[in-house]
Curated annotation (Swiss-Prot):
One of its GO terms (biological process) is rRNA base methylation. Disulfide bonds join 120-351. GO terms for molecular function: 4 iron, 4 sulfur cluster binding; metal ion binding; rRNA (adenine(2503)-C2-)-methyltransferase activity; rRNA binding; tRNA (adenine(37)-C2)-methyltransferase activity; tRNA binding. It comes from the Bacteria. This is Probable dual-specificity RNA methyltransferase RlmN. Reaction proceeds by a ping-pong mechanism involving intermediate methylation of a conserved cysteine residue. [4Fe-4S] cluster binds at residues 127, 131, 134. S-adenosyl-L-methionine binds at residues 177-178, 209, 232-234, 308. The gene is rlmN.
Length: 364
């Protein structure tokens, strides 16, 4: 729930007349009900309507009194976004472009795997991290999303899956934006979707990825939550990583690795390193050896990413044979590594591409 204190801490949060009902954690809903003269147990009924029955209107919550429904309508909205574009790939990947209440647009992607359906969610409108290979940063950062706007992305995808009696089985927070720059709303989102009364998606089926906001890595390590953790690394030395990710100038590789070691010591959980391969930049055998040396003491996995071409960027794809050689060298050196399967190559698949193509309000 967005409080005055939260708004003071997070200047990039929106200032809507009514906040999303999906922004409330279960405990916050209970507290709000009591503060408004209602019975605490109504929280369970409301969450059932929101996350199990997935109604679109507060008036559809028929086991609530008319008085309570009116109070809810006076204080909250259920409409946080509308679908503007829905692109479906030959491989079943679906990319959604949503328009928010203030006209900004965000992307969400449904990816189908043998093991289930994964949703990639966005945490910010735009991004200020400035990765030189990413379309998401082209328009800069406009604002942070409320927790409810992040929840609504998953719910909208789930409602689409309801038509074929499927369910969202995994969530990855790897869409537009840097999750750790919207930390409190991201944490509320995680608690809502993980809650037994919410979407009840297991913590081990949710992954958060960061570009390396070091103070927040320490905070995340201290959270009592079993969420999977990934780091966008892309370079094993400061020269290459700073070229690809300017944030490395503020949080260099040495300091980043110190934070990652702290995280693993505190949580005893495996870490995933996202490593995009860029032709002629970071994709040679010597780069694989340098990467292996950097992470050899960690319980980790390397996810090698054949990068999607972004028209506004100049990077080229690494040839397939070089990708396989890179993976083979990591494995020879004892590093667990896999190559990410390319999905949605025919539908503006790179993060931020669809939004960049359709963006109107943001570019005024």
């Amino acid at each position: 729930m967005i409080t005055a204190e939260k708004k003071k801490k997070n200047k990039f949060l929106p200032n809507f007349e009514k906040q999303s009902i999906y922004s409330l954690r279960y405990d916050e809903m209970q507290d709000w009900l009591v503060q408004n003269g209602q019975q605490k147990f109504r929280a369970k009924q409301i969450f059932e309507w929101l996350y199990e029955k997935r109604v679109d209107d507060i008036d559809d919550m028929t086991n609530l009194s008319k008085e309570l429904r009116e109070v809810l309508k006076d204080n909250f909205t259920m409409t946080t976004m509308t679908t503007v574009v829905k692109q479906e790939s030959k491989d079943g990947t679906i990319k959604f472009l949503f328009e928010l209440q203030d006209g900004y647009t965000i992307e969400t992607v449904l990816m189908r795997h043998e093991y289930g359906n994964s949703v990639c969610v966005t945490t910010q409108v735009g991004c200020r991290i400035g990765c030189t290979f990413c379309a998401s940063t082209l328009g800069g950062l406009k604002r942070n999303l409320e927790a409810g706007e992040i929840v609504s992305q998953v719910l909208t995808v789930q409602k689409a899956l309801d038509e074929t009696e499927e369910r969202v089985s995994q969530i990855v927070i790897m869409g537009i934006g840097e999750p750790f720059e919207n930390y409190d709303e991201m944490m509320d989102f995680l608690k809502i979707v993980n809650d037994d009364n919410g979407l009840n998606i297991g913590a081990r089926h949710i992954t958060v990825s960061t570009s390396g906001i070091i103070p927040r890595i320490y905070d995340f390590a201290d959270e009592d939550i079993q969420i999977n953790f990934a780091v966008s690394l892309h370079g094993a030395n400061d020269e290459i990583r700073s070229r690809l990710m300017p944030i490395n100038r503020a949080y260099n590789v040495e300091k980043l690795m110190e934070a990652i070691h702290y995280y693993q010591e505190k949580t005893n959980r495996r870490i995933t390193f996202e490593y995009g391969l860029f032709g002629g930049v970071n994709d040679q055998i010597e780069h694989a050896r340098e990467l292996a040396h950097l992470i050899q003491e960690l319980n980790c996995h390397v996810n090698l990413i054949p990068v999607n071409h972004v028209p506004e960027r100049n990077y080229v794809k690494t040839p397939k044979e070089d990708i396989f050689k890179f993976e083979k060298e990591l494995k020879r050196l004892g590093i667990n590594a896999t190559i990410r399967r390319e999905q949605g190559a025919d539908i503006d698949a790179a993060c931020g591409q669809l939004r960049a193509k359709e963006r109107k309000v943001e570019t005024r």
